[in-house]
Each structure stands twice: as structure tokens, then as C-alpha cells.
Amino acid sequence: MIHIIGTCHSLQVWTDAIRNGESLDARKESVEAFESYLVEVARLLKADMIAEEASGEWVAARGHGAYSVAKGVATRMGIQHLFCDPDTGQRRTIGLKVGEELRTHAMTVSKETRREWTEVHDAEVKKQFSTREAVWFERLEGCEPNNRSIIFVCGADHVNTFKAALDAKKNLASIRCRCWTKGA
């Protein structure tokens, strides 16, 4: 079964700035609390894998000393970890806009429609959810998710859509937490 935990992305990664209390993205105490929560849930569910909406590239781009909270927990617990999100090159290959290309596209649509840029950008990102979630499913599918206990950490905005996608593919899935963001 896949147990979905939604959170904010800033809690998914440790960086030197967070450890030193210099980050504007997340507080050290919040990341520590999320890390403890993952350990607790993994033990409770007897998880043998923690997968996440992230890629190694995305984690590294977060800054100096960056590493995945989920990967760290999995390593310490001696269980498998899996990055499920496509990296920049893979996103382009499957037709998704990324980085500056996405920002420019959102700016163009914003000007043409006279809508706020942030509103347009958020809508454009959400249009890509189903494609990205299909990649996550494909990567998890090879792990026989119906025959084991897998925790899947993702952004809170994906919790309902990813659960629905898993249900449609006849995968056992539950929402463990819709939005774990304590003090983020």
C-alpha cells in the first residue's frame, strides 16, 4: 500500500542554511519535526520504502549541504528510498515546461489574458500535475506497491490528485496526512 504524506517542499530538504538558522524557506525545528514524524510513521506502518516527489537534481539545487529528509530517514532505518520526480531533462523530454521557459510562458499568458502572473503560473504548474504524477506511478509500479508498505512524500497540492490516480490504476493507497506543515 502507498501511504501518502503531503507537506510543503521546504520541509523535504536539509540545507546548511536551515541547519544554521539562516534559511527563509524553513525553520530548523520544523524540518527536525518533519523528520521525526517520518521516522514515527515509517515505524508504525512498517514501511520498507520511502519515495518522494523530488529528484536528486532538485535536492542539490536547494543549496549548499542539501540532502533529502526522506532519503536520510530511509538510510538510517535501513529501508529503500526512491526519488520519483523527473529531473529537468526528463521533464523536457515528456513535454513539460520548466524553469525560465515556464516563467516566460506564464508571463505571456498573463499579459494576453490580463490575469495576475502568480495566478497564471500556479494554473500552468497544476496543468502538469497529471503528467508528473504518471511518472511517479510508473516509477513506483516496478516496486510492487500493492505488496509492500511504501510512504510517499509529496507537496500537499498533489495529495488528492495522486490518490485518485493511484485508485484509478487499482493501487492500494491511503492519505496518511494531507498537509504536514507544522511551523514551516
Task: Label the model's feature ranges.
Residues 1-184:
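Compositional signal for N-terminal targeting/processing segments
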